[in-house]
Amino acid sequence: MEATTSLLDAAAVGDLVMLDPLSEESLLRTLQERFSRGEIYTYIGEVVISVNPYKPLPIYTPEKVEEYHNCNFFAVKPHIYAIADDAYRSLRDRDRDQCILITGESGAGKTEASKLVMSYVAAVSSKGEEVDKVKEQLLQSNPVLEAFGNAKTIRNDNSSRFGKYMDVEFDFKGDPLGGVISNYLLEKSRIVRHVKGERNFHIFYQLLAGGSAQLLQQLKLRPDCSHYGYLNHEKSVLPGMDDAANFRAMQDAMAIIGFAPAEVTALLEVTAVVLKLGNVKLSSCFQASGMEASSITEPRELQEISQLIGLDPSTLEQALCSRTVKVRDESVLTALSVSQGYYGRDALAKNIYSRLFDWLVNRINTSIQVKPGKQRKVMGVLDIYGFEIFQDNGFEQFIINYCNEKLQQIFILMTLKEEQEEYVREGIQWTPVEFFDNSIICDLIENSKVGILAMLDEECLRPGTVNEDTFITKLNQIFASHKRYESKETLNAKHVTDVSLPLRCFRIHHYAGKVTYNVTGFIEKNNDLLFRDLSQAMWAARHTLLRSLFPEGDPQRPSLKLPPTTGSQFKASVATLMKNLYSKNPNYIRCIKPNDTKTAMLFTPDLVLAQVRYLGLMENVRVRRAGYAFRQLYQPFLERYKMLSRKTWPRWTGGDREGAEVLLAELKFPPEELAYGHTKIFIRSPRTLFDLEKRRQQRVAELATLIQKMFRGWCCRKRYQLMRKSQILISAWFRGHMQRNRYKQMKRSVLLLQAYARGWKTRRMYRRYFRSDACTRLSNFIYRRMVQKYLMGLQKNLPPMAVLDRTWPPAPYKFLSDANQELKSIFYRWKCKKYREQLTPQQRAMLQAKLCASELFKDKKALYAQSLQQPFRGEYLGLTQNRKYQKLQAVAKDKLVMAEAVQKVNRANGKTVPRLLLLTTEHLVLADPKAAQPKMVLSLCDIQGASVSRFSDGLLALHLKETSTAGGKGDLLLVSPHLIELVTRLHQTLMDATAQALPLSIADQFSTRFPKGDVAVTVVESAKGGGDVPVCKKRGSHKMEILVH
């Protein structure tokens, strides 16, 4: 829905076929509006218009690739990925070879467009180790070729200075197998000269900026561009281009393609030779005869070049400063003047670089070409230099613009002229659309008899004095009345004055505009003459790569035949290219340059309008609006879509046209969408075609399911028959096997029964002579004797009856160890039982008290260890012997548990007073020892808890309930010499009386309740503490410190 909205947007439609009203102004306004939104792609039907934004845009992400993969061309926004996907699917699904023609001015973004197409095809094709390797090699050919074939021009920082056509070959699944690259007319004159504001080829700057110090030393180069005469010193560094990083990327790309390190080194050595040739300086001198000659001014550069290529410096110097002229059967060595020497030096540099570039392309082809014998489909991608109009246009611009005229001719013939002619041939009603046919311009240039290239070749081969003046004169004579040719002389003949046209220039009215060409250098560049002495010198070099570039230098193969001229070679190459393109289904990407300053997102309407006019976009829109988007012969159309109708599927016995009519009638498409020609079916709207293709895909899926069902059924039947046959065979063999096993088992059983019977008879006969159970009886006897001996020995060596003695004799035999341990345990339990039976009730009570004390104080209070050896007597006052104390016992009225003398700590001043403590089963009594009168009688139920310290003191704090009678005076602080026994008996008595344990706190600091409030008691271990009685000190009204020793 989003894409459809974009295509139908009234302000900026995505497809110019839908533009209403259609005019140059509305078309230009639409392109500008879309460009301002960042939408640089627009459709004219299936033609993509691309406007160069001169900045990166976030529209080439993997998510975008996924969005356009296998998608309807018009179901998504206009994008270069859409035409790449459409071409790829046509190649894969329709088995039609494709070519993608990318045209436009220099700087319009053609090279980037070709890389985007290649990267998209690589992304959507299948994955796999071998396939990924091929795709990576195809993609990595771009950085290598760009380094050696691209340069900065006035209009483009990365202008292709050669034409590149790549045929990518695929298998039937659409996986890339490899490819072949063809290159056309490298601008080798750029090696020796280029205009101000431009640069030489990228590789020179990359090598000097990115080469390591070791590499540059090996190539005898300096990292300073100003040192080399062939480099433009003013523009050596290009903003926004990292030459060092690009050099590393080129090296990585070469490794991926498969260049060996030795090949890379050899390639860079030859490149360095070209660069250093520009530093070879010549000076004028005179021979003895008075003839002018030349000599090398600075021999160092010559020596370094000679070292790089493995050639004697004198041989190279002789080749640069002289030439051999053959007169009949004699060879004469002629000295060259300085100008002739420089011409030879530059010609050598141009030829070395040009042939090195050809070798580079062939070497890449060696790595990426497909092995012969494989069936393959082809997608061609053409990236060639765009139309060029400079201030001074020479031979290179003439050749480049001729190539662009041929590409425009293809576009005209295949999209405008041929399409309209086809409608007439097929009898389709059609209103002709006027358009400019540039055949007249192509004929002006390439006519084999009177074309400009033919006249240039004739002038180059003509004997006598040959120069550009005779060439321009001949052109003026032949094309004096030609509508597309102008010169100073032809205009003067028509009485037209044009001061902008110099004498040695001619002007051609190209489809892209008028271009004025300066004929200076035409003959020289067309001849491309290289002295044979230089070729032979290169052949004599020991450098393997350089030697292979000059096979004509072999003295054993002399040839007097002149090599073909540059113009004739290029004309033949273009003809081959055009033939190749005509054999494929074309897909067009028309690139437009929005401004001349390479400014990001700047749109210059006048410049764009000029390109819209000469690219014929208006005519293209008119033809598309009036024409049909798809046409195909009836037979392949019916073969492809016949499964959509039950009447034509699976076989149609009638004619192909009748079958197509029956098929489309059943599908019920609108009549205006279809037209039936004499031999072809025509479909007007791409949407109708996409709907047809969508139905076919659904039907193919259904048929595939049907075929799978039938195949699975056939497989199941075959599998069943095989399993049934196998089951019968296995059953037969198994039954036989079972019968044989049964027979063997029966035989073994019979033999076994016979053996047992014979044995039984024999044993019965001789039983009285054998003692079969003697061994068992003997072993049982020995076992019983050993057990008896063990028990008797144990009886004699029993350990003492002391409970603390846990010794036990070891087992004499290993098999008795478990029994020995069990007897040890039984004996110890019996010994403990006997010990308990001997105890008196008083001893039992004391042991229980000791156990309770252990549970309360062990590892918690230091005094506990001293109480272990002290018996718990309970009564320490001698109440029965002392009559004075007997009346105290009467006060208690219940059973006495413990009686002892204690010290009571005064709550007011912390001083201690002696008291007698009597603990009975229900009360605790404190009495005056002198008067033997009770001072306090406490019920055990009134005791809330007790607190003691961790040290070895006898301090005890009894916490009383506030609600009790004695509790009103506060808690009690007592010092007992038998603290452990006192607390233990108090705990046991409380358990017996109330079934509740005594809450006991063992801490150095605890809180007590006195009449005047709570007091924090802190027990401190100190040398100042008293011996048996602690020292109590009050620290204010709420703190008390007790020092213990």
Swiss-Prot record:
GO terms for molecular function: actin filament binding; ATP binding; calmodulin binding; microfilament motor activity. Residues 11-697 form the Myosin motor domain. Residues 701-727, 723-750, 746-774 form the IQ domain. Disulfide bonds: none annotated. One of its GO terms (cellular component) is lateral plasma membrane. Residues 861-1044 form the TH1 domain. It holds the Pfam family Myosin_head. Keywords: Actin-binding, ATP-binding, Calmodulin-binding, Motor protein, Myosin, Nucleotide-binding, Repeat. Residues 574-596 are annotated as: Actin-binding. Intestine. It comes from the Eukaryota. GO terms for biological process: actin filament organization; actin filament-based movement; endocytosis; endosomal transport; sensory perception of sound; transcytosis. SMART domains: IQ (SM00015), MYSc (SM00242). ATP binds at G104, E105, S106, G107, A108, G109, K110, T111. Could play an important role in morphogenesis and function of intestinal microvilli. Belongs to the TRAFAC class myosin-kinesin ATPase superfamily. Myosin family. This is Unconventional myosin-Ia. It comes from Gallus gallus (Chicken). The lineage of its organism: Eukaryota, Metazoa, Chordata, Craniata, Vertebrata. The gene is MYO1A.
